[in-house]
Amino acid sequence: MKWLKHFQSLHTKLVIVYVLLIIIGMQIIGLYFTNSLEKELTQTFKNNISQYAKQIEINIEKVYDEDNAINAQKEVQNLLNEYANRQEIEEIRFIDKDQIIMATSKQSTRSLINQKANDNSIQKALSLGEINSHTVLKDYGNGKQRVWVYNLPVKTSNDGTIGDVYIEADINDVYNQLSNINQIFIVGTGISLLITVILGFFIARTITKPITDMRNQTVEMSKGNYTQRVKIYGNDEIGELALAFNNLSKRVQEAQANTESEKRRLDSVITHMSDGIIATDRRGRVRIVNDMALTMMGTMKEDIIGDHMLKVLKLEEDFSLDEIQENNDSFLLDINENEGIIARVNFSTIVQETGFVTGYIAVLHDVTEQQQVERERREFVANVSHELRTPLTSMNSYIEALESGAWKDGELAPQFLSVTREETERMIRLVNDLLQLSKMDNESEQITKEIVDFNMFINKIINRHEMSAKDTTFVREVPTETIFTEIDPDKMTQVFDNVITNAMKYSRGDKRVEFHVKQNALYNRMTIRVKDNGIGIPINKVDKIFDRFYRVDKARTRKMGGTGLGLAISKEIVEAHNGRIWANSVEGQGTSIFITLPCEVLEDGDWDAE
């Protein structure tokens, strides 16, 4: 169907219109020319025949005016014989007033002389004395042909009609001549049309070429290519249109570049936003979602694109789009229960100037940490209040007992005062621990580091506890080579005191505390392991023992004088030394506390070099 497409092109249509206009024009001109030429030729032909008839009439009048009636017929015959060789004249007859054929120019019809002519046109000419003519078809042996019959009455000087000059003239030559002229005209028209078609293609091309270029450029623009330009062929309207089209293409290219730039910028902003973004169409179907939203919800993009936003956020049973549009409040949602992520969701509506809603946007702000901090703050306040209330209540009870007269009892009074002092010391330890944690949270706790021989440092701490705890066996596995580390001795002493004290407190039976120190020279790290044979910690609670005020067995810990802050302080101190502390425990088999710290093995002479 390629030819059909070419036939329907503007170029071909212009050529066809151009050719049709030429054909119509040539037809009109040809029709007018043919009609005019036909009239002119036939009129000329008839005028010539009329002149012949007039000459014959004049001569016949002379013959009859001379009163030579005896020789009149012979002279008329001689006169007609003179016109016998005229090409356009087929036959000339002279009929007298009695309609008797007196003479004829045609040899083959002389047998009709002295016979009566019954032609109506002859009767009309003789009876009315008027000229008449008409065209008939006659066959002279060569087929039927047009014959113009002309009747001219012959009158004497006294207006008496003496006869009729009857002429049959072959007018077919005139029409043959017209036919030849028409053929020449048709051939000329055909040649003109051929030239017109050829010129039309070139002329139409001057119009359609810029339009074709603009069409091709439009196709390229639809594909996103705005670099091509339409060639300007002149300063006419087509040229102005091409110039305007080039300007339009340039502006569209600039606008597209700006749009793409803004889109990339917007995509980059949405992608790297710390908040999750979900954008929908006007029906609430998810069309855009950024990586943060996918991470928060723990899902894949292809799993939610096209789904309803309320279904994705698990709100379809509680709200509708209309309610969200009317309600500007935010919501707290457990956006990912598996990960424990809580998000604050804010909704906004995309509205056109006409008020038509085109979509919705949901902004997911991760408030998990905030909620956890708030929860920990409430728990912290509750724990501090509880830890202070217990000794204060106990002290208040003993003071009331002393006020009631127990101070007079020599046996009870010292016991009450001893308990009051212990509770006071416990509150002082609690407040001191809280102050230390507060300083570390505010990074106002000063850490004074110095390079120490860790072997000597840890052995000194173990020796001290070993001397005071006669019922506990201490097992050491410390490398013989010297290990140096940069620490704050006082702060790290506090850490190991807390860990060792807990190990001794919770050991049972034949109490045993093991110390293992291993060095990783490749990473310049060392690991200290303190293991007891105590009651152990449930596996689901191991990670929580470093939380503030957390106790596995609250009653037992409080009975042993613990504040629940020792390991929390130890964790802060270890992390301040770029270290790490964690626990590993099997319930009923004991607990191991692991501490990693930076270290360095110094060769002999390194101290002197410094």
UniProtKB/Swiss-Prot annotation:
Gene Ontology terms: biological process: osmosensory signaling via phosphorelay pathway
UniProt cross-references to InterPro entries, sorted A to Z: HAMP_dom, HATPase_C_sf, His_kinase_dom, HisK_dim/P_dom, HisK_dim/P_sf, Light-responsive_reg, PAS, PAS-assoc_C
Catalytic reaction annotation: ATP + protein L-histidine = ADP + protein N-phospho-L-histidine
Compartment annotation: Cell membrane
EC number, UniProt record: 2.7.13.3
GO MF annotations in UniProt: ATP binding; phosphorelay response regulator activity; phosphorelay sensor kinase activity; protein kinase activator activity
Bilayer topology term: Multi-pass membrane protein
Family matches, as Pfam families: Cache_WalK (PF23846), HAMP (PF00672), HATPase_c (PF02518), HisKA (PF00512), PAS_9 (PF13426)
Residues bearing the modification Phosphohistidine: H386
Chain ranges passing through the membrane: 14-34, 184-204
Protein name (record): Sensor protein kinase WalK
